[in-house]
């Protein structure tokens, strides 16, 4: 009986050391950070002369630009970022790549995208699109 109790205690002690390696990104981790888009679906941007950015403020306020500027109050839940009431300007850009990205970005944010922050890289992903941003805070 004592051996069983000792084995049970050892098993419980060891199980306490196991953790879930997949940790969801929280709103607090994003807050007060600015990110610049580096790639779309694994392809680097063709023109990086105009930084395409996304910033996170208080209460998960999201703002940034693609072809158009966008902003809205978001929510991060279970590793998903949603900005249900996203405001976006509606201009036509000379750059076809930016025009192609504008609508999908709006849809990603409104419908929800998986968000992952790993060191200096932010990834927004849906079933058909992946956007990778790098940390580019204006102040260290």
Which ranges hold each PLM region?
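Sec-dependent bacterial lipoprotein signal peptides
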Residues: 1-15
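Lipid interaction determinants
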Residues: 17-140
